[in-house]
């Protein structure tokens, strides 16, 4: 009797055979000429679960970068992928991640197998959402680790993850704090927007992360502007990397369907131009880029008050994570809206159907320009881009763009489209000290952003019109700016502070034993928080910073503009008030009486002020010496008479003109009354004539005015009358018959 086969064993054997066939297809892919003309995901050597996930997510056709990057990534090569914005780079590295773990039979007990690092939180969330869609048919566990979330909750789940999508700062924090977080089994490392991650801002963080990763891993780098720096590639320990470039025949890095233009405007006219643009594009979806978060907040708060007629949103790195995700969701769903943002949404974020990308501040280089305009014209759709350049920035920046083969045209603004809002901004700053403070911070942050730029040919710091720019923001004058350090050092410190984890900063403040000081660990109750509660509006912190008087001037990282309050010696009236207090009930009653209080106050005095602001009494008399010094009495009298005569003549001219105007107005009113009266009389006459005609028509016609109907009645020979009842009726009937 034969032994029955185990179905689980048969299933395992079938799975092994499928894996071996799939591995064979991957190894041999590209040898046949037909493999080079792949157009669909089904034609690639992918697992059934991945193909099914792509189909369910409506991904059927491969883009150029996907069919060039996926096969070598499946074969285990390190890649440097460069493609236009909106060309599908996310799928180009997520599909190899799933296939790598699937062919290695990865399970929960194997730990973390793939690591995807993104420079911004919003981009990491977007990558995670795409991974959930295409990987739904696999059994891998994936997680998202970004700043702004609960660290303890993330730490509990890290040990069970197979695929981790994260930002550099939060990943390094978990590597330092979370026990059991092991990166020794990582098979694949993916850096999205690699040129941004490898720059100076993330240098220390990325070096610490790379030290803990295995050397034999596979590394994929993707960006629209890829780095080829030897030092960067050496840091990543790439082994014979392959450079993948989509559309190598074309030279431009921007989408073909993107219409790119620029306008040359003065710095002080930028907000006026932006206002006019928004007023004429209220039915479009627009992203407006600024160089700093302070400028974003100022423009958002002021434009929101002025109401340009289009929904406004703002997004910058100083917002809480929940607020940032809410703004991204609202803008993605909106059909017409304007988003004021910094460069945190310049890379990788896919906002659907963006019509316009407006860059109010000049980008630092051509690569930043490419990433910004890439938010529009994605996946073959059309879009438009507009760049604001000052006359000093225009020549050098256009040269940089032409060197990258970026086609851009110059536009001129119609005079009828220009509208100045300087007066409105000045009124807002005058009414609200919070808006004024935001304007000061926006002014300073713009100056700092220009000062720290490397390309001094484009950004000429000394040629900025400070007073005119401050006036355009509604400020009474240009704030003072402290720039004690070099531009390179300031930029390095700003990037390090911006990208460093706040939790790591807290650990750095701990002692040698790793214990944080008691002051920072002090328990604060609900009652303490209630008494510490301050003004709850969005600008309360800025207002407090403006009015506080104990700021440290030597603090280099603090605010540039703070109002210093100085103590003055004030005369105290407490002693007089105590002396005037009533001593009895009667005196207290008299003190409450208005009549009695007026007796004690005495007579009031009237003071006049001259043109210089000096006070004078209402009547001032000259001394005898002053009177004699002015000259003889006769000459003074003559001068006085002449002066008064001249004043009276000038006043007489005005009085005559006023009387003339009053007479003309009186005459005009009289004629108007007469005209109205004539119209009323004419209307009455016309009505009377109409009434008389009706009366005549109602009268009985004469014998010679009889109509046809009366003739017909007479021709009948019949006279219809009522039955006579009296003698008078009989007499009248007799007379009628005789007449007939």
Swiss-Prot record:
Q: Which residues bind ATP?
A: 83-90
**What EC designation does it have?**
3.6.4.13
Q: Which Gene Ontology cellular-component terms appear in the entry?
A: nucleolus; nucleus
User: Could you tell me where the Acidic residues compositional bias lies?
Assistant: 680-695, 709-731
Does the record's keyword annotation contain Hydrolase?
Answer: yes
Q: Which GO terms of the molecular function aspect are on file?
A: ATP binding; ATP hydrolysis activity; RNA binding; RNA helicase activity
Q: Which residues form a coiled coil?
A: none
Localization annotation: Nucleus, Nucleolus
The Basic and acidic residues compositionally biased stretches are 7-28, 636-662
What region holds the Helicase C-terminal domain? 257-421
Give positions of region: Disordered. Answer: 1-37, 565-740
> Origin, by domain of life?
Eukaryota
Per UniProt, the keywords (alphabetical) are: ATP-binding, Helicase, Hydrolase, Nucleotide-binding, Nucleus, Ribosome biogenesis, RNA-binding, rRNA processing
Catalyzed reaction equations: ATP + H2O = ADP + phosphate + H(+)
Gene3D superfamilies tied to this protein: P-loop containing nucleotide triphosphate hydrolases
Motif Q motif located where? 39-67
InterPro entries, from UniProt? Answer: DEAD/DEAH_box_helicase_dom, Helicase_ATP-bd, Helicase_C-like, P-loop_NTPase, RNA-helicase_DEAD-box_CS, RNA_helicase_DEAD_Q_motif, SPB4-like_CTE
Q: Name one GO biological process term.
A: rRNA processing
Q: Which PANTHER family match?
A: RNA HELICASE
Q: What does this protein do?
A: ATP-dependent RNA helicase required for ribosome biogenesis. Involved in the release of U14 snoRNA in pre-ribosomal complexes. Required for pre-rRNA cleavage at site A2.
Which family, according to the similarity comment? Belongs to the DEAD box helicase family. DDX10/DBP4 subfamily.
- Please identify the protein, giving its name as recorded: ATP-dependent RNA helicase DBP4
Query: Which organism is this entry from?
Result: Yarrowia lipolytica (strain CLIB 122 / E 150)
Q: What is the lineage of its organism?
A: Eukaryota, Fungi, Dikarya, Ascomycota, Saccharomycotina
Q: Which gene encodes it?
A: DBP4
């Amino acid at each position: 009797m034969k032994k029955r086969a185990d179905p689980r064993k048969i299933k395992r054997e079938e799975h092994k055979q499928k894996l071996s066939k799939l591995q064979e297809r991957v190894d041999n892919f590209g040898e046949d000429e037909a493999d080079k003309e792949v157009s669909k995901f089904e034609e690639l050597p992918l697992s059934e679960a991945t193909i099914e996930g792509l189909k369910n997510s409506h991904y059927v056709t491969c883009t150029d970068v996907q069919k060039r990057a996926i096969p070598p990534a499946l074969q285990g090569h390190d890649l440097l992928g460069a493609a236009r914005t909106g060309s599908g780079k996310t799928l180009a590295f997520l599909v190899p991640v799933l296939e790598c773990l699937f062919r290695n039979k990865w399970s929960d007990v194997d730990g973390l197998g793939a690591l995807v690092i993104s420079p911004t939180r919003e981009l990491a969330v977007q990558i995670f959402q795409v991974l959930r869609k295409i990987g739904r048919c696999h059994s891998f566990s994936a997680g998202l680790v970004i700043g702004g979330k609960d660290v303890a909750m993330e730490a509990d789940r890290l040990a069970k993850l197979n695929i981790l999508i994260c930002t550099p700062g939060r990943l390094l924090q978990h590597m330092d704090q979370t026990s059991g977080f092991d990166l020794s089994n990582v098979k694949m490392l993916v850096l999205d927007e690699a040129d941004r991650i490898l720059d100076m801002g993330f240098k220390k963080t990325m070096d610490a992360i790379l030290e803990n990763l295995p050397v034999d891993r596979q590394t994929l780098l993707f960006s629209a502007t890829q780095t080829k720096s030897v030092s960067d590639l050496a840091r990543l320990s790439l082994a014979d990397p392959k450079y993948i470039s989509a559309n190598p025949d074309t030279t431009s890095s921007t989408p073909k369907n993107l219409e790119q233009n620029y306008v040359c405007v003065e710095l002080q006219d930028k907000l006026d131009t932006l206002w006019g643009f928004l007023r004429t594009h209220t039915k479009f979806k627009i992203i407006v880029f600024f160089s700093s978060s302070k400028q974003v907040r100022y423009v958002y708060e002021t434009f929101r008050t002025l109401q340009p007629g289009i929904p406004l949103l703002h997004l910058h790195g100083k917002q809480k994570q929940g607020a940032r995700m809410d703004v991204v969701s609202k803008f993605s769903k909106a059909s017409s809206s304007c988003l004021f943002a910094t460069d945190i949404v310049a890379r990788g974020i896919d906002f659907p159907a963006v019509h316009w990308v407006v860059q109010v501040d000049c980008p630092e280089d051509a690569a930043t320009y490419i990433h910004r305009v890439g938010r529009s014209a994605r996946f073959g759709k059309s879009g438009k881009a507009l760049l604001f350049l000052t006359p000093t920035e225009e020549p050098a920046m256009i040269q940089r763009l032409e060197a990258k083969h970026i086609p851009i045209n110059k536009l001129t603004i119609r005079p009828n489209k220009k509208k100045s809002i300087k007066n409105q901004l000045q009124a807002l700053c005058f009414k609200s000290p919070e808006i004024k403070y935001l304007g000061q911070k926006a002014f300073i942050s713009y100056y700092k952003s220009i000062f720290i730029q490397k390309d001094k040919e484009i950004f000429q710091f000394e040629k900025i019109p400070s007073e005119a720019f401050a006036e355009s923001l509604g400020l009474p004058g240009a704030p003072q700016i402290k720039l004690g350090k070099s531009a390179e050092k300031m930029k390095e410190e700003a990037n390090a502070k911006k990208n460093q984890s706040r939790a790591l900063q807290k650990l750095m403040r701990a002692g040698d034993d790793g214990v944080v000081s008691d002051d920072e660990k002090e328990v604060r109750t609900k009652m303490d928080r209630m008494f510490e509660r301050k003004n709850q509006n969005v600008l309360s912190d800025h207002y407090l910073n403006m009015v506080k008087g104990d700021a440290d001037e030597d603090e280099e990282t603090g605010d540039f503009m703070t109002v210093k309050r100085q103590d003055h010696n004030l005369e105290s009236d407490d002693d007089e008030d105590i002396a005037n207090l009533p001593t009895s009930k009667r005196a207290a009653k008299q003190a409450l009486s208005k009549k009695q209080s007026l007796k004690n106050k005495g007579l009031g005095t009237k003071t006049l002020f001259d043109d210089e602001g000096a006070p004078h009494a209402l009547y001032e008399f000259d001394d005898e010496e002053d009177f004699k010094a002015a000259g003889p009495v006769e000459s003074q009298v003559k001068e006085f008479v002449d002066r008064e005569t001249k004043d009276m003549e000038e006043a007489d001219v005005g009085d005559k003109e006023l009387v003339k105007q009053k007479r003309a107005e009186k005459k005009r009113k009289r004629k108007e009354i007469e005209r109205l009266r004539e119209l009323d009389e004419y209307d009455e006459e016309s009505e009377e004539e109409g009434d008389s005609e009706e009366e005549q028509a109602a009268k009985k016609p004469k014998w010679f005015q009889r109509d046809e109907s009366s003739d017909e009645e007479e021709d009948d020979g019949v006279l219809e009358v009522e039955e006579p009842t009296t003698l008078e009726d009989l007499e009248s009937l007799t007379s009628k018959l005789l007449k007939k």
